[in-house]
Amino acid sequence: MSFQVRPATPEDVAQMHSMIIELAEFEKAVEEVIATEEQLYQALFGGTSFSNSPANTPSGAPALYAHVIDDPKNSGQLAGMAIWFLNYSTWQGEYGIYLEDLYVRPQFRGQGLGKSLLKELAKICTARGYTRFQWWVLHWNEQALDVYKSIGAVPMDEWIVYRLTGDKLTQFAN
């Protein structure tokens, strides 16, 4: 069976939103998904953009990007997706890619689709001269950890992720 990675289109948004919910269910955090299809569409295709796009990206670059893989047996159905955005290293003075979501539907796992999506983003990094490609993974997701190790990715064990949200964010801001 042949799988092809391609940039997402507006027609993919509904299925991508469904896969975001599927991913959240897998990660035991479905109650945290409040984003709508419309918000996803706007971030990907609706004109939400960085006001000052980096020189090595198209002018008016979108705030969010996505690549998908079609189900070769079911036209119009998606097998997997990668949602990503640009980040920047102040130490290296270069842009990179931050992978927000990587998801392959259960019936397609173990066939190399996750690696194919990761490889496509790595190709974008190298073609554009970006110097890093990074993401987070839950410590219990052994299947994903195995994939990441197999491609040569290394964990950044010395870092701790912090987050401010909701009332704590508002309280601190005020």
Protein language model features and the residues they cover:
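Conserved N-terminal entry element of GNAT/NAT acetyltransferase domains
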Residues: 1-14, 25, 169-174
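Hydrophobic adenine-recognition pocket in adenosine-nucleotide-binding enzymes
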Residues: 8, 102-104, 137
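Conserved GNAT-fold acetyl-CoA-binding loop/helix
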Residues: 17-53
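Conserved beta-strand in the GNAT
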Residues: 68, 76-86, 103
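A conserved beta-turn-beta hairpin within the catalytic core of GNAT-like acetyltransferases
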Residues: 77, 88-99, 109, 156
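Conserved acetyl-CoA-binding loop-helix of GNAT-fold acetyltransferases
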Residues: 104, 110-123, 146, 150
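Conserved active-site alpha-helix within GNAT-family acetyltransferase domains
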Residues: 115, 127, 139-158, 164, ...
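Conserved GNAT acetyl-CoA-binding A-motif
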Residues: 126-136
